[in-house]
Every structure is written in structure tokens, then in C-alpha cells.
Amino acid sequence: MKLKKPVFLYFLLLAGLAASATEYQNTNTDQFPLRIHPNGKHVTDNNGKPFLMVTDVAWQLLRKLTYADVVQYMDIRKSQSFNTFVLQLLPALPNQKNVNKIAPFQDNDINKPNAAYFDYLEKIVIAAKERDLVIGIVVSRKSWNVVFDSKKEDDWKNYGRFVGKRFAKYPNIIWIVSEEEYQSASQFSAIAEGLRISTENNNLVASLSTCSPSNLAHNAANRSDLKFVIPDSTVTFGEYETLTNWQKNSGQLSQQPFLISNSEFPKEITDQSALIRNQAYQSIMSSAAGFCHMSTIKNFYPTWKVNITKDGAEYIHHFVKILKGIPWEYMYPNHTPGLLPDSTDQRQIGTVSLTNNRLSMLYIPESKPVLLDLTKLRGNDFQIVWYSPRTGRRWTGASITSSTGALITPPDAQTGWDWILLVGARE
């Protein structure tokens, strides 16, 4: 039997979150700019409503897509429940131009921006705002080091100030500064400062890493509001392993919101749909602010219009639908040690719980029975609810009594299916 809406509210009432559930239903078009949640782990809209960031990587959008294609891309991703996309402001190489054959600077001098280049970006920002989409704009990149390194701190700051002022009136922008490409933090700090002092809306300023972030403290030299971790084609298998381990511990390590993209080595995988779906839920299990989806669409090859409906994004709508019924923003990883007695399950299954230990959510990457020690949760009687990330369907499971060996079985034994399991105290 499908879980009805009152059961959603039942779980929320148990958790003392009824007010939050009511707030979650409110709609307000004045949702930008985004803010940092008081818990320091997540993002909210401008009204304080939790904002699950569902982000698509669109690195080469400026270089490859005409305006008509940009609009088509946005409309497709919007229909798939994405609310954010990120792009590179600068072309991949200093000798390249945007789709209109315009370079960002005259003579590659960052003090001499080409107005037409930024005019085209503005059209895209406006189109995104009209669709209630957040646009993350990466303003610096490793391949441009030869250009930026020839300048001084004042030049970097002026560049950040110019870009920030040029788009100051648009609250749907998140500025992103690449933080790992430099031997020192000076360029990051100067560009970020220029962006911060020129914005009218206090837009978030984020940082971008392609590997595990090395410093997550609030007082780090590269101070940012939000961290994006998006591997690129140069990341090695070993670095992916390090990134995966970092993600498993990031709920404790990170002191600010973060989004992580595909943290498993994908080069030998033809169909990445299952991997991407797995990564989306593992991100939430790591206490991320959402999920950053990355596929070959980021390069906008000639086949992108065909592939955009089958690149793993077909499951994102279910991802958003499922999480809207769960107080994910109040749940934290590793809060109920011992809930999974089996050591293999501990390695494979992601778990988050409310701090009062009355509700836990588990992501089970394969269809199999799961052994739970319910004495690690608060309560005597528990309600089970299942969700299928593959189909979006939900089931009401059994009511069970607390015990050290509760064996919970998925409602449909489909080979290769993954599952979301909710376990909530009834009393």
C-alpha cells in the first residue's frame, strides 16, 4: 500500500517538525538570493525555507550553445527537477571564445573585458531567473593561470569587482572561485573580495575543488560560503578513492555546506545512470546540501539533445519527490552508531538520523534484507516506509517492535534495485 500524506506528517510530528512541514508547502517567488542555513550544513532560500540544491554541471554552455539552445537546455533540466546549474565563465583555453566568437577580454587582459561577451552571459542569467533557476558562475580556472599569474593582487580584485558589479542586480547567482589551482590563496582571496564588495544582494561566494578539499575550517585562508567538489578528467583512480573516503566522513569534517559530484571512478562505465542515482543519495547521506549531477552533457557534444534525457537525470525527479517528504535538512550521518550490526552493511549502506534518534533514513544500494538493531533508536514501536529511487514509488511497511535483530525486507525483490528505508518511532 502506498504511503499517504498523513503518514508524512505523522513522521514530522513525531520529530517535532510540523511547523517546518507547513513552511515547506509555502511558495514565494522572492526566493533569491540563497542563504546559509543556521545549522551551517545546508542552504535556504531568502525566506529561510530549506533549499535542496539539485545542480547540473554545464561547463561549456557559454562556448557551445546559442541562446535558443540555452533556453532549451534550461527548460529540460527544469522539467527534470533541477533548480541549479553551474558553468565556466571563461573558455577552456585563453585563445578560445564563446559561441558568438567573442573573447572575454581584449588581448587576454583581465583589466579589459569585452562588453559583448558579458552581455551574452547576462541574457542567460535573466533566462535562468525567469525560470527560478540558480546559476553558479565559476570565474577562474586552472587553464587561465598563465593569464592571471601575470597580474597583481589589485588586478585580480578589480576583475572580481567588475564581474560582481556587472551582475550585481541578479540575486539568482552564486559566484564560484576555483581554490585549488594556485600555489597560494592570494588570487582566490582577491577575486572573492572583489565579488563580495560589489554585490547588491550578498550573493553567496563558493569555492570549487576537483579533489578532496584540504581545509574546511571557517578561518581558512580561502574563505567561502559553500563548497563545490566536482572531479575533472585529470583526477586519477587513487584520487577518486580519496574523494570517496572524504565523502564518507564529510558530515563530521565539513563546517560549511558542500555539494559533491560523482565521487567514483566513471571512465570504464558506459551507462552511469545507476551510479549517478547512487551518488545522489550518498551525497544526502553525507549531509551534503544537495547533489551535483555531472554527465557528458557538460561538454555539449552534438548529441547532447538526445542524451540529456538518458544521462541519469531521469531519476532526479524521483530524488526530489522523495526528499520533499522527508526532513532531510534535520538529519545527520553516523548519529545512530550500531543501528546496522553487520559490518558489510555498515560499509555499503548510508544512514542519517534525526538528533533525537526517533527517525532514521537508510540508502540501500542493492535489493536485500537488512538487519537493524532498533534499540539504538528511541521508541518501542516503529513504522517502516520504503521508497524506490528507481521508480519514485513508496510503500508502507510493517509496524515492528524494538529489538536487537529486526530483519527488514524490501517490498519488491527486483534485482539491481536500490532502496530508501525510513524507520520512525510511532509513539
Predicted regions and their residues:
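Bacterial N-terminal signal peptides that target proteins for export
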Residues: M1-L9
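Sec-dependent N-terminal signal peptides
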Residues: F8-F11, N278
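Hydrophobic h-region of N-terminal signal peptides that target proteins for export
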Residues: L12-S20
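Non-catalytic accessory regions flanking glycosidase/transglycosidase catalytic cores in CAZymes
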Residues: A21-Q80, R358, L372, L377-T396, ...
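Active-site mouth of glycoside hydrolases
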Residues: Y24-G238
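Aromatic- and carboxylate-lined catalytic core of secreted/periplasmic carbohydrate-active enzymes
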Residues: N26, P266-K267, Q272-A398, T409-E427
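Extracellular glycoside hydrolase catalytic/binding regions
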Residues: N172, S178-D311
